């Protein structure tokens, strides 16, 4: 029934999701929807969580092997292309649209995104720890920004595929810059760290002065 709900969402849109259409997709009696879940909102929330858990589990092993930002971006591109072809991009769009009117779907969609964010954060902590950026970066915040960027790109691509491609290329350039800094010798890396410390300290001093 959860898979039937996801297929209905992706294929017909949130406006067409009902006990009847879900039951037809799942090949069951529609009375079972309310017997097992109580309401359509509860079914939608459960299906959203189920779908996210399945997708994250599929890529968890690959993400655990990533050793660089370029590697993270490479698997991100692969996930993007695979999920778009499988129809999961349309599913994300429908869940985000449904979150505006279905009270339970908003938290469930956020929880699903949090599963991705957790995995991305683990990668960022690992790959940034040995770079000059490790002590200054906010892995959790960056993970949320990356997840939000890819969701946005997945939705944006439907309107402007060329623009979405350029955005991904720009992310690759940023990853290449980080890799270039990481490839510097010890002396140069110490200079970069010192410069970053001064840059971070200036806003903090300005903030204290304003208080």
Language model regions located:
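C-terminal regulatory/effector modules of DNA-binding transcriptional regulators
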Residues: 203-211
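Hydrophobic alpha-helical connector segments
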Residues: 46, 57-89, 139-146
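Short helix-capping/turn signature of helix-turn-helix
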Residues: 37, 95-101
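Generic hydrophobic, amphipathic alpha-helix propensity
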Residues: 1-6, 22, 47-51, 55, ...
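Helix-turn-helix
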Residues: 4-42, 46
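Amphipathic alpha-helical packing segments from all-alpha helical-bundle domains
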Residues: 56-57, 61-62, 84-93, 103-129, ...
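Hydrophobic/aromatic-rich alpha-helical bundle segments in the mid-to-C-terminal region
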Residues: 106-110, 127-203
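N-terminal hydrophobic signal/anchor transmembrane helix of membrane proteins
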Residues: 49-55, 64-66, 181-182, 187
């Amino acid at each position: 029934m959860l898979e039937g709900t996801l297929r209905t969402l992706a294929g017909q849109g949130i406006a067409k999701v009902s006990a009847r259409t879900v039951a037809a997709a799942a090949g069951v009696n529609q009375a079972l929807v309310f017997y097992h879940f109580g309401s359509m909102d509860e079914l939608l929330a459960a299906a959203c969580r189920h779908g996210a858990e399945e997708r994250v589990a599929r890529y968890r092993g690959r993400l655990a092997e990533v050793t660089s930002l370029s590697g993270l971006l490479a698997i991100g591109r692969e996930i993007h292309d695979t999920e778009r072809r499988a129809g999961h991009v349309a599913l994300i769009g429908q869940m985000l649209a449904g979150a505006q009117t279905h009270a339970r779907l908003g938290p469930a969609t956020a929880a699903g995104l949090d599963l991705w964010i957790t995995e991305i954060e683990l990668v960022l902590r690992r790959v940034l720890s040995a770079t000059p950026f490790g002590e200054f970066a906010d892995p959790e915040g960056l993970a949320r920004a990356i997840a939000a960027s890819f969701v946005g790109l997945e939705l944006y691509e439907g309107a402007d595929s060329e623009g979405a491609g350029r955005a991904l290329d720009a992310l690759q350039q940023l990853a290449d810059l980080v890799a270039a800094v990481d490839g510097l010798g010890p002396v140069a890396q110490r200079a970069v760290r010192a410069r970053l410390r001064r840059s971070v300290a200036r806003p903090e001093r300005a903030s204290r002065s304003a208080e």
